[in-house]
Design a protein with these regions (language model features):
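Signature of soluble extracytoplasmic/periplasmic domains of secreted precursors
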Residues: 1-206
Length: 206
């Protein structure tokens, strides 16, 4: 799978962790990657899926299913078990399964089919951050050119005990009751071998 991604995807990568309507299910996770040639990338992915060794308890018919929306049916590919999704996103998932589909000229990867369908539905309904007031307010102080950017509700991050929270510096954990009231925007720009951080905290009531 890593070789497939190296040959078919570009340098633009977006990792999303968002709440489902049923909070008992835990957050949904999706990795979105730019693709150089969608038709060729999908042809190669289909071949990869069809020629992969069969897993115990699964048949070939379950390797390709569909995500149905009011306007289109998207093929969903069940990939061989791998830790690559966790390596690329740092999202610790209980399953090694990865599901893939193509949407809007991009390759979407997720640990479950439900995450993919919810992500596509949000995009179809134009439920994106670009138009959100909190997003615009937080990015006003950031550069238009960057190599990495993170936006996260600090309260949600601190609730991910055993998952993403181990990446949070100890200072924020010690003062978690204070920082859970903020939205975190972190941006990193690389120039001449130097990494320049830019961090903005926005109070949620604003």
């Amino acid at each position: 799978l890593s070789r497939y991604l190296a040959e078919n995807t570009g340098q633009d990568l977006v990792a999303c962790l968002f709440q489902r309507e049923d909070s008992l299910m835990g957050p949904a996770a999706v990795l979105s990657l730019s693709v150089m040639d969608v038709a060729e990338a999908e042809r190669m992915l289909r071949s990869l899926v069809n020629t992969a060794p069969a897993e115990e308890g699964t048949g070939r018919n379950s390797r390709i299913t569909f995500c149905y929306t009011p306007s289109k049916a998207y093929p969903v590919y069940r990939l061989p078990q791998t830790t690559l999704f966790t390596q690329l996103t740092s999202f610790v998932e209980p399953s090694l399964h990865v599901f893939a589909t193509f949407y809007g000229g991009r390759l979407l990867l997720a640990p479950d089919e439900d995450s993919l369908s919810r992500y596509i539905r949000h995009l179809d309904n134009d439920e994106v951050l670009d138009g959100a007031l909190a997003y615009r307010a937080g990015t006003d102080g950031l550069s238009d050119s960057y190599h990495f950017m993170l936006m996260a509700d600090f309260g949600h991050v601190l609730e991910q005990s055993g998952h993403q929270v181990h990446y949070v510096p100890e200072f924020f954990l010690r003062n978690s009751e204070f920082f859970r009231n903020f939205i975190l925007f972190a941006q990193f720009t690389c120039a001449d071998g130097v990494v320049y951080p830019n961090i903005v905290l926005k109070y949620k009531s604003e």
